[in-house]
């Protein structure tokens, strides 16, 4: 394994493949989408009366938690739900890990937009809730970014890589 810092150099000989979060465009790499394009709006599981959110407009009353790799998330959300201009999409605490952001929501720090694949277990267990279950996309949105299986262009013929790719994408 090669430790992740901020990007991968797919010309490095020790790098066979990576799972990356982004838009699927990395120089020198083939990328296959895995998951993560469906984004969920999540709120603390407290009583609805304590966090009353009945329409997308109500979201403006709360602290919006943001992830550093998707700074446009709240802007995209507000455009999807027709409330652009009602929220400041750049205000609110930033996190660099989605799991930390989910825990912040669980602690009542605010609302967050998180890839559904990373928060579905917490939603199902009732640890967080989707405050707009009847809205389009259950209050979330479809994103242009997600998780991708990537590998260097020069490694497409590696048998082990082909087997792993087929298993992962099945």
Cite the ranges covered by each PLM segment:
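Beta->alpha turn/N-cap motifs
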Residues: 5, 20-24, 44-45, 97, ...
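Central regulatory/effector-binding core of bacterial HTH transcription factors
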Residues: 1-27
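Flexible hinge/capping segments at coil-to-helix
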Residues: 27-65
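A late-sequence structural motif
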Residues: 133-170
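Short secondary-structure boundary/capping segments
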Residues: 9-11, 30-33, 55-57, 83-85, ...
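Hydrophobic hinge/microswitch elements
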Residues: 86-130, 135-136
């Amino acid at each position: 394994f090669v430790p992740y810092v901020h990007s991968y150099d797919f010309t490095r000989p020790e790098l066979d493949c990576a799972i990356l979060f982004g838009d699927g465009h990395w120089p020198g790499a083939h990328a296959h989408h895995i998951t993560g394009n469906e984004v969920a709006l999540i709120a603390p599981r407290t009583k609805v009366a304590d966090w009353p959110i009945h329409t997308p407009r109500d979201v403006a009353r709360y602290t919006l938690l943001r992830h550093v790799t998707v700074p446009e998330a709240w802007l995209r959300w507000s455009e999807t739900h027709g409330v652009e201009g009602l929220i400041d999409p750049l205000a609110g605490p930033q996190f660099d890990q989605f799991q930390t952001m989910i825990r912040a929501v669980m602690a009542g720090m605010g609302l967050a937009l998180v890839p559904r694949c990373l928060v579905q277990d917490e939603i199902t267990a009732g640890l967080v809730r989707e405050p707009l279950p009847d809205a389009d996309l259950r209050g979330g949105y479809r994103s242009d970014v997600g998780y991708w299986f990537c590998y260097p262009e020069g490694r497409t013929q590696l048998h082990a890589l082909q087997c792993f790719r087929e298993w992962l994408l099945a």
